[in-house]
Amino acid sequence: MRAESNAVLLVVTDRPDPLADVARETCPGTLVLSTGTYLDSQRFRVHLGKHFGADPAHVEAQVIGDHGTSQVFLWSSARIGGVPVAALLARRGERIDELRQALERDVRYANITIIEGHDASQYGIGIVSARIAEMVLNDERAVIPIGSYQKKFGVTLSLPSIVGRRGVAEVLEPEMSDEEREGLRKSAEALNKALHRVRSKPREKATLG
């Protein structure tokens, strides 16, 4: 792998977060991002929008941590039109636990469902990758959940971040419930284990261009 020393490198290959850490280690000085949970967050919003009959553009909901089964859904801050999802469910007499179980399963295993139905799942990740590239090229300063190295956890994982021409300009760690914060810690642990497995495999040494 070759990269310019001032490049912003976006890792798309599944599993993107551990591979972003490998890229960061093998290309020192390169700004490395992973697509992380951006696509998962979009799917989270779409599913919530469908459930409530609302345009996903007006749904505020994020998935953080690992792009994988240990990802964390931020239900405590999920809102539609500024109204907490928990309050909307209470008005309808619905239980959040039931919706949560079904929706999280659908988002976590969306790729498998799509592949079974269409024999391909590249379109969603292709769209979000192109969108991230636009944010960087146009210095949009957009705020999205995206994977970047988090010194606090020792791995690349997704948190809401300001994205511009130099990659992640600032990480905006959101308010979380105790359960969500513990989920993020466990997600980081899972990523550390995955990174250890990747590191244990032989690979060619990368050089900078």
What residue spans do the PLM features occupy?
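Long, compositionally biased stretches enriched for glycine and/or charged residues
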Residues: K50-G209
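Rossmann-like NAD(P)(H) cofactor-binding subdomain of soluble oxidoreductases
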Residues: M1-H47
